[in-house]
């Protein structure tokens, strides 16, 4: 890891964070344990969307789905992701990534993450499209 990338395992869940040197979407850190603070849920979703510029991991797509299922408004997360990327990420490109489930294939180790939802990339795509319509 580098100074701008850290990983933790908390209660069996691997948390990995990358910090852009110029931008941070975190508006309010949440105290977790001792001197450990974590990003708020909207910021996590924004970081997940931003990292999709560099990788197409199913777990990122799934995480975005889970966050949206928890009631976080997609429009707010999209705006935050665009800001976080320094506007290198464009709305049109982000929407194209989010609404193309074919980009995301479930890796062999995904089940080790003990997902709450049994959902396919196609089902996530449909859900995201529905969220965008509302």
Regions found by a protein language model. Give the residues of each.
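Compositionally biased terminal segments of proteins
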Residues: 1-134
